[in-house]
């Protein structure tokens, strides 16, 4: 790959004063005839060399230059000279470095590379890390994944000293030798199959986070040195069930989580006082005495069939997930608990004023039953009873604002609920002998999740079933009742019907103030003209997987030629005020979609199965449309898109010509299959995203003339270079031609990490722009390289870069010899890197 470098900056004589330097450089920059290539960054670097007595004037010059070129502007920490003596030596040293724009840009550059190497979905493996040539790039990588067949031994493939996190794959199950893991590692995550005995010295003394996999079930203690003292987070897998004694857990652990099968007795002092988050799972069934739970625990999750003793839960606890004997209420739960979640069913016969549900909690999650089945949090009860029970007065405190209740056999009377505090209510109902009424729900409730079970025998949601205070309504997955007119609250703004709803909407069944509607995966009913078209406040609507009915937005007449389309729908069935139309990712929608010119829609998102051509079946005639997102399978010509569109996102199957893009387009995203020429892109385009892993090999930005020139250059290069070098030169030349003519400010190609991760940032201003080009390549999974391109560009850079001054002949371009030996190429890269690092640390420390 051909490397691009900075153009050499001209030197200035010492006889010139700083203001004269600045003035001359500005005049040379503004004069296009002198052929000078001075850019704004060069001028700015010289302004930093002015004398102290001219500091005030210098700040004004800097501000003036920064206003002309925002690409190189930074925030200065200005201070008065009289106050300079008040700063400490460290502060003066910091300001002297921070004010140097060159050093500051270098710092941000290294920060960007660090983010590029670590903000990835798939961590780099140890094999890939050892193939990276440059030591600088190795230091940037902080996360490494150990595969199944990789050996982590000092003599064959050591782990570098800069690694901070190790992730072992699920297949890894090999012993680890002492001293193999460096002291720089602070986090280790083992895979599911790891079940090896850990001995002293195998884990580094600096380790802070340790997470075991599902199958791990070995004795590990702090007293014998298996677990380091520095541990702050310790997480065991589901199979772990070893005895816990005193001093087994390191004294600095703050988060301790046990797995599903852990069921060992605990005594006071076994868990260190440093623990603030403690979790046990369903199989834990041990008595808790005073002091067993540390006094500093704030987050506690516990299961136990033994009675909860007074004082067993410390006063420091604020969040409690309790799966024990829930029928005790909150008699022995401290007042400090603000968020309470019961994980098993509660028999309301035992809930009295003395056993009320939390005296001070603001959030409660519980399952109310008469011993019936059901659970509010996924823990099922097998006992059954036909007795209908109700909440008793004052059994739930008046301070609760977030309440979750599962009612299995009968509704509660609202006088037993906190009527003046509950604003968020999740209500589950099943075997009701009476239809749902608004008297079951507090009048202060604004957000309601109504989960009606399959055993609910009523078929309709009657009028005034929900109080008028509700503004956000969500139905559960089993809801499939006919919504009668005026049954929903008049102030309702958003509604989610759930995945089970598939009933036709009736006229006046939805309130006029509603602005957001979401249908579930089962809904596939035709929408009549008089149901939603008059909803003047509706701005967003989303359809699920099964929906495949015609949609018309606007006052036009649709051309219905599809046999699957209901011929009764001829006019607009969606309101013109709609701003966003979305189909779920797995949507099967293929019917008519017609958007008239009077529509106010701005955003459309299609599902993955949509692949219809833009004709009478799909007509986008609106003038306000700004964004379209197509799914994975869309691959149709795009010749009739509205000119108002500013953002286009295509899926991985799209591979059509993009010659006729909207002239106002600012953002374009192309999938992995796209291999067309990027020609005639709109001048308004700012952001371009490409996901094709062969992007560098398919660069076809240039026009025919440039292609002919490239062919001639290739013939000359064939005499001295091999075919691989010619391909790299072609790619670089094509990329240069593209950069010369484009107005794009940002290009992203975030492909798979095993193939290509390519980011280009281009920030344009009046006369100058900065181009940053980072390329992370793992070619054929056996070679890794990170290359940085920095170009300082002005208007005449590509046209006059070979000329010294007007009237002089262009200087001869010196062709860099590309060494054929791979080792020579690596040495050149390493030497250039060492040169840059030397100057960086020189300016930083001296």
Swiss-Prot record:
Stretches assigned to coiled coil: 702-734
Amino acid composition bias (Basic residues), ranges on this chain: 1-11
FNIP repeats: 159-193, 194-239, 240-283, 284-325, 458-500, 501-546, 654-693
UniProt keyword Iron-sulfur, yes or no: no
Annotated region described as Disordered, given as residue ranges: 1-39, 362-384, 702-734
Family matches, as InterPro entries: FNIP, STK_FNIP-Repeat
Biased composition (Basic and acidic residues): 20-33
Keywords for this protein: Coiled coil, Repeat
Pfam assignment, any one: FNIP
Protein name per UniProt: FNIP repeat-containing protein DDB_G0289381
């Amino acid at each position: 790959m051909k490397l691009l470098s900075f153009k050499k900056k001209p030197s200035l004589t010492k006889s010139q004063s700083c203001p004269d330097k600045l003035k001359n450089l500005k005049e040379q920059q503004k004069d296009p005839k002198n052929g000078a290539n001075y850019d704004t960054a060069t001028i700015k670097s010289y302004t930093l060399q002015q004398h102290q007595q001219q500091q005030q004037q210098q700040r004004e010059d800097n501000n003036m230059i920064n206003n002309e070129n925002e690409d190189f502007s930074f925030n200065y920490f200005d201070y008065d000279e009289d106050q300079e003596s008040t700063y400490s030596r460290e502060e003066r040293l910091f300001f002297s470095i921070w004010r140097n724009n060159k050093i500051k840009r270098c710092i941000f550059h290294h920060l960007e590379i660090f983010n590029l190497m670590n903000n990835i979905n798939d961590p780099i493996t140890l094999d890939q890390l050892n193939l990276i040539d440059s030591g600088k790039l190795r230091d940037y990588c902080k996360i490494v994944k150990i595969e199944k067949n990789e050996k982590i031994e000092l003599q064959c493939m050591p782990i570098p000293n800069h690694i901070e996190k190790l992730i072992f794959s699920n297949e890894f199950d090999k012993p680890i030798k002492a001293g193999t893991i460096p002291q720089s590692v602070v986090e280790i995550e083992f895979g599911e199959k790891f079940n090896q005995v850990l001995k002293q010295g195998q884990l580094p003394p600096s380790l802070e986070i340790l997470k075991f996999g599902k199958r791990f079930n070995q004795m590990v203690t702090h007293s014998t040195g298996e677990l380091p003292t520095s541990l702050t987070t310790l997480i065991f897998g589901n199979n772990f069930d070893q005895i816990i004694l005193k001093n087994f857990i390191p004294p600095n652990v703050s988060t301790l989580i046990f797995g599903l099968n852990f069921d060992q007795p605990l005594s006071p002092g076994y868990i260190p006082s440093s623990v603030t988050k403690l979790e046990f799972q369903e199989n834990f069934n041990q008595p808790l005495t005073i002091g067993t739970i540390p006094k500093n625990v704030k987050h506690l999750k516990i299961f136990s069939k033994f009675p909860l003793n007074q004082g067993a839960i410390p006063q420091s606890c604020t969040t409690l997930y309790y799966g024990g004997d829930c029928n005790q209420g909150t008699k022995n739960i401290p007042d400090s608990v603000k968020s309470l979640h019961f994980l098993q069913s509660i028999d309301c016969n035992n809930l009295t004023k003395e056993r009320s549900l939390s005296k001070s909690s603001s959030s409660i999650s519980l399952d109310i039953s008469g011993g019936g089945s059901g659970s509010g949090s996924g823990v099922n009860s097998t006992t059954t009873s036909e007795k209908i029970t109700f909440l008793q007065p004052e059994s739930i405190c008046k301070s609760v604002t977030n309440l979750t209740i599962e009612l299995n056999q009968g509704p509660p009377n609202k006088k037993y609920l906190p009527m003046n505090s509950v604003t968020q209510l999740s209500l589950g109902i099943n075997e009701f002998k009476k239809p749902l009424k608004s008297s079951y729900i507090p009048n202060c409730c604004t957000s309601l999740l109504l989960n009606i079970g399959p055993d609910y025998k009523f078929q309709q949601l009657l009028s005034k079933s929900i109080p008028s205070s509700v503004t956000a309504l969500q139905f559960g997955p089993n809801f499939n009742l006919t919504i009668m007119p005026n049954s929903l609250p008049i102030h309702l703004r958003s509604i989610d019907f759930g995945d089970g709803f598939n009933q036709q909407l009736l006229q006046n069944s939805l309130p006029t103030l509603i602005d957001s509607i979401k249908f579930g995966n089962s809904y596939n009913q035709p929408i009549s003209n008089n149901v939603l078209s008059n909803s003047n406040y509706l701005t967003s609507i989303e359809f699920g997987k099964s929906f495949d009915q015609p949609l018309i937005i606007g006052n036009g007449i649709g051309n219905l030629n599809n046999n699957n389309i209901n011929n009764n729908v001829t006019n607009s069935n969606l309101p013109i005020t709609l701003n966003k139309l979305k189909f779920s990712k797995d949507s099967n929608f293929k019917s008519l979609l017609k958007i008239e010119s009077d529509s106010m829609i701005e955003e459309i998102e299609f599902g993955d199965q949509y692949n219809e051509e833009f004709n009478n079946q799909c007509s986008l005639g609106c003038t306000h449309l700004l964004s379209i997102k197509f799914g994975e399978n869309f691959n149709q010509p795009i010749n009739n898109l509205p000119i108002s569109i500013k953002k286009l996102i295509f899926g991985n199957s799209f591979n059509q010509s993009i010659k006729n893009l909207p002239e106002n387009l600012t953002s374009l995203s192309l999938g992995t299959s796209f291999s067309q020429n990027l020609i005639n892109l709109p001048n308004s385009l700012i952001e371009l995203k490409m996901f094709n892993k062969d992007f560098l090999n398919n660069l076809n930005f240039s026009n025919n003339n440039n292609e002919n020139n490239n062919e001639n250059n290739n013939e000359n290069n064939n005499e001295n270079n091999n075919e691989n070098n010619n391909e790299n030169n072609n790619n670089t030349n094509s990329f240069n031609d593209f950069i010369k003519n484009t107005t794009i400010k940002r290009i992203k190609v975030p492909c798979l990490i095993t193939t290509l991760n390519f980011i280009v940032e281009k920030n344009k201003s009046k006369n100058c722009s900065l181009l940053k080009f980072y390329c992370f390549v793992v070619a054929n999974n056996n070679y890794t390289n990170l290359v940085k391109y920095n170009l300082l560009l002005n208007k005449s850079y590509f046209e006059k870069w070979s000329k010294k001054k007007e009237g002089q002949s262009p200087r001869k371009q010196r062709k860099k010899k590309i060494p054929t030996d791979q080792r020579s190429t690596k040495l050149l890269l390493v030497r250039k890197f060492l040169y840059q690092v030397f100057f960086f640390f020189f300016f930083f420390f001296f």
